[in-house]
Amino acid sequence: MALALLSLLNGLSYGLLLFLLSAGLTVVFSLMGVLNFAHASFYMLGAYAGYALAEPLGFGPALVLAPLLVGLAGALFEHAVLRRVHPMGHVPELLVTFGLSIVLLELVQLVWGRAPVDFRAPQALRGAAFTLLEQADGGLTAVAGAAAAADCAAAARCHPFPANRLFMGATSLLALAGLWLMLARTRLGLVIRAAQTHPQMVRALGHDLGRVFLLVFGTGTALAALAGVIGGSTFVTEPSMAASVGTMVFVVVVVGGVGSLGGAFVASMLIGLLQTFAVGFDQPLLQGLPGVPPALARWSLAQLAPVLPYLVLVLMLVLRPQGLFGRPSP
């Protein structure tokens, strides 16, 4: 029971981080029709910017300033480069953003090197947020923070939940709530939603679509950078983090339905829970079946966890190519 609860919380926190990262890409595509190939590179850039700012200023200011600076850089890129390429079609946009991803990767390696940097959350987030004490009779007791050694010794099992995981989920949730409020409750959000379906009408009413595109692209890159600060301090900050998380983001976007924010949320939760439960309940898949070679009989769910999102992607492309909430092509 405790293991299932911890796997659920880990899956939700990881899923919220994935959604925070994929939400920016989804909003940019739904409004501008741009599939930003460099989106994960802004995630990496946010992690390194947070690392650089955390040393002199502290983690809290870095958590705020790094997304703002990266979002400003994304807005400048949209204004100076992407806006000129946008009328040429999707292929030039993909090539330009792909080139940007290479430039950002080389820039990060030039400044910070290829090895991981020591970017960690503050001391307050390095311990346990709470501890689940599982009794021999199956009962559960939750203790705030790290449980005392005597309490762990008296319990059948002791399961701490990391504070940085709780912070990751809570911060992602707050940022996404702010994004929802902006899109659903403000005049700017009304203009953005109207521009998704009726851009010519929005322009005819006197709104500057170029300024809307600038703001949306900057917001999308800022969300990616915020996810980078959180994810980089929780997992690892290294140049390859963009490549490792970038494929996962595109899996989320395609499974949820390209351009669908609700679909990206459901897909993020699905993939986060699928991976964490596979690792948490590590069981041999083929053990005991007749005729199975010993090498295959040792395969476990944890070994297949990195592959499971891509299996979901393949099944989705076969059974429902438009994704969970996407619209079928006419």
Residue ranges and their predicted role:
Residues 14-15, 153-238, 261-266:
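Helix-loop-helix "hairpin" substructures at the membrane interface of multi-pass membrane proteins
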Residues 20, 70-72, 247-272, 309-319, ...:
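Hydrophobic alpha-helical transmembrane segments of polytopic membrane proteins
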Residues 58-101, 107, 266-271, 275, ...:
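Alpha-helical transmembrane segments within multi-pass membrane transporters and channels
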Residues 9, 31-76, 80, 144-148, ...:
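Membrane-embedded helix boundary and interhelical linker motif in transport proteins
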Residues 84-85, 93-185, 212, 277-306, ...:
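Transmembrane helix-bundle core of multi-pass membrane transporters
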Residues 2-17, 182-187, 213-259, 276-285, ...:
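Inter-helical junctions in multi-pass inner-membrane proteins, predominant
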Residues 3-52, 77-92, 210, 253-262, ...:
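Single transmembrane alpha-helix segments in multi-pass membrane proteins
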